[in-house]
């Protein structure tokens, strides 16, 4: 039996050993096409936030009309959450060479300066401001104060700025430190309203009357992640388990046809900073 096996193994090993180096395989045209498409999407996204930025604040406008026709005269209205996505797009733009590192830094410095001086409510920014003044533009009658969800989207961007520039030159390190300070000033614990849940809104005029306790599952998970990880205004695990997860009730939602699912929108917003 052994005499039969050994010759067979020799034949197998000889067949597996290439007599010469295999020819290099050409790059997949599909992969090349995908890469080009990916770059195009990145560039167009960056261009929206760069060219379409409100000029005073540097932030993303709530609506950008390329023809400069604004029937509602809202060309200066900027958005906190959307601008957080824009901040990350600018970092991508720097990496891709769409703008220089210095150009990107200076634009981000303008944004950070606006965030430092614009209306803020217990560390949280409103959904909208007037970019020219930094004054809040009410999202609705009683929504004229802090918006902790939109603030969290902005913080995602600022934390990316911190990580990107923290080991750079003196100007970059200063920008990273300012971004870090803004994140540490958000009073997540205060937005509990004394309960084991986080509230979406607070108004200086109407207090907690919006009464929107945020529970999962939706696009707001990042707010709880940031609240739990805040080194200055953190919350306990009970806030997550009782508030977001509803003591297990979160497992009962979003199961059409018995399959756990949800809208991509709910996933996309809170994972903007993962990459």
Regions picked out by a protein language model, each given a short descriptive name:
Residues 1-26:
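Bacterial Sec-dependent N-terminal signal peptides
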Residues 16, 24-275:
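Ser/Thr/Asn(+Pro)-rich, low-complexity disordered segments
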